[in-house]
């Protein structure tokens, strides 16, 4: 598997049963598209996100009826619940009382100091962290006047101002995000932030667009940020089904060796040498391994030129030949199979390797107990 990219060490912050920062893995987050007060729809969407591999989910809370739904939602899901709060500090207090795992606020729009202090006091009492969410599109007026337009320095200045509000109240369970729709601006802001404080960073490119273009833009931005060892949680923001956000995030993390429990598919580009329906087989195997939660690399190659030698790092793979397929493990051919059954044979081998790796994980856990 790819070597894990080094991530800048940050202060560990507990969110539910996860720890963000420190030397812990990068966590995938998404956000629901439902009205939060519609409990059935919201829970159903969160369960779909869980199945896709989402590890933390955020919900909007613009109204009191949304806050009143949080306790029931929390009781019916299996991952940490984060609540987005703007302007009304009483909604933050209700969310904390409901037992959510984190709140996302901008201390600058909550109101007077005593309102911020009330939120922080409640969060401290319940050991609930706060994410400070800075957005290039909504910087404070005095910062825009100072810099003329959104800049990385202005975004970090805003973050530091909000951090100080919380630190002055002796609150340190803080996570920070500095989002922009411009990739270069986001990259510069996160780089400067990583040099300015040690709180964990939630990274993403905001308002990145619909599925195809948004995925590409997010991959470019997140890839650049992660390659510098920056980022503790990620969200891919798409104008699409949030399940797609999770899928894209997983692929980005896998590209950097940062997905500890996911399967990776490699497949060759098509050319005139292929003897099998490569595109259909690759798509079928990609779907088959989508929910696997162990480290495994699978290869689907169109001919013997590209495989098995060029995919020797794969745990299991298949290379097409005329009327047959060559099954191989770590570059070594294990057997030939008829073309008609090679996909099913590959799936059987994948299943066997998954069982092996799951047994190894359990044995490792037992040895540490």
UniProtKB/Swiss-Prot annotation:
Cofactor: binding comment: Binds 1 [4Fe-4S] cluster.
First-level EC class: oxidoreductase
Pathway entry: Isoprenoid biosynthesis; isopentenyl diphosphate biosynthesis via DXP pathway; isopentenyl diphosphate from 1-deoxy-D-xylulose 5-phosphate: step 5/6
Assigned keywords, A-Z: 4Fe-4S, Iron, Iron-sulfur, Isoprene biosynthesis, Metal-binding, Oxidoreductase
SUPFAM superfamilies listed in its UniProt record: Dihydropteroate synthetase-like (SSF51717), Nitrite and sulphite reductase 4Fe-4S domain-like (SSF56014)
Keyword 4Fe-4S listed: yes
BP-aspect Gene Ontology terms: isopentenyl diphosphate biosynthetic process, methylerythritol 4-phosphate pathway; terpenoid biosynthetic process
Entry superkingdom: Bacteria
Names of the cofactor(s): [4Fe-4S] cluster
Catalytic activity, as annotated: (2E)-4-hydroxy-3-methylbut-2-enyl diphosphate + oxidized [flavodoxin] + H2O + 2 H(+) = 2-C-methyl-D-erythritol 2,4-cyclic diphosphate + reduced [flavodoxin]
Binding residue positions for [4Fe-4S] cluster: 268, 271, 303, 310
InterPro entries: Dihydropteroate_synth-like_sf, IspG_bac, IspG_bac-typ, NO2/SO3_Rdtase_4Fe4S_sf
Molecular-function annotations in GO: 4 iron, 4 sulfur cluster binding; 4-hydroxy-3-methylbut-2-en-1-yl diphosphate synthase activity (ferredoxin); 4-hydroxy-3-methylbut-2-enyl-diphosphate synthase activity (flavodoxin); iron ion binding
EC code: 1.17.7.3
Family: Belongs to the IspG family.
PANTHER family registered for this protein in UniProt: 4-HYDROXY-3-METHYLBUT-2-EN-1-YL DIPHOSPHATE SYNTHASE, 4-HYDROXY-3-METHYLBUT-2-EN-1-YL DIPHOSPHATE SYNTHASE (FERREDOXIN), CHLOROPLASTIC
Function: Converts 2C-methyl-D-erythritol 2,4-cyclodiphosphate (ME-2,4cPP) into 1-hydroxy-2-methyl-2-(E)-butenyl 4-diphosphate.
Protein's recorded name: 4-hydroxy-3-methylbut-2-en-1-yl diphosphate synthase (flavodoxin)
């Amino acid at each position: 598997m790819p070597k894990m990219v080094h991530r800048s060490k940050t202060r560990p912050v507990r969110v539910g049963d996860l720890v963000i920062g420190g030397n812990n893995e990068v966590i995938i987050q998404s956000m629901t598209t439902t009205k939060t007060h519609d409990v059935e729809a919201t829970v159903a969407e969160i369960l779909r996100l869980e199945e896709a591999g989402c590890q933390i989910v955020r919900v909007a809370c613009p109204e009191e009826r949304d806050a009143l739904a949080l306790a029931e939602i929390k009781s019916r899901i299996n991952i940490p619940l984060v609540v987005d709060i703007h302007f009304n500090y009483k909604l933050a207090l209700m969310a904390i009382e409901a037992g959510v795992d984190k709140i996302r606020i901008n201390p600058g729009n909550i109101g007077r100091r005593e309102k911020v202090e009330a939120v922080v006091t409640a969060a401290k009492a319940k050991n609930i962290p706060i994410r400070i969410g800075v957005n290039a599109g909504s910087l404070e007026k005095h910062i825009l006047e100072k810099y003329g337009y959104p800049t990385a320095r202005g975004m970090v200045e805003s973050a530091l101002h909000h951090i100080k509000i919380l630190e002055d109240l002796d609150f340190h369970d803080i996570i920070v995000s500095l989002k922009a729709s411009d990739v270069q601006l986001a990259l510069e802001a996160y780089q400067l932030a990583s040099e300015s404080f040690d709180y964990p960073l939630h990274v993403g490119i905001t308002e990145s667009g619909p599925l195809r273009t948004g995925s590409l833009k997010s991959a470019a931005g997140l890839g650049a940020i992660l390659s510098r060892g920056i980022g503790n949680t990620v969200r891919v923001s798409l104008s699409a089904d949030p399940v797609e956000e999770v899928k894209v995030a997983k692929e980005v993390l896998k590209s950097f060796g940062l997905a500890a429990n996911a399967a990776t598919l490699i497949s060759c580009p098509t050319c005139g040498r292929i003897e099998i329906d490569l595109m259909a087989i690759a798509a079928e195997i990609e779907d088959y391994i989508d929910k696997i939660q162990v480290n495994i690399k699978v290869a689907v190659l169109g001919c013997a030129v590209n495989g098995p030698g060029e995919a020797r790092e794969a745990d299991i793979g298949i290379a097409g030949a005329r009327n047959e397929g060559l099954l191989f493990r770590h570059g070594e051919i294990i057997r030939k199979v008829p073309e008609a059954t090679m996909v099913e044979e590959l799936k059987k081998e994948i299943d066997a390797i998954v069982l092996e790796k799951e047994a190894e994980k359990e044995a490792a856990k037992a040895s540490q107990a």
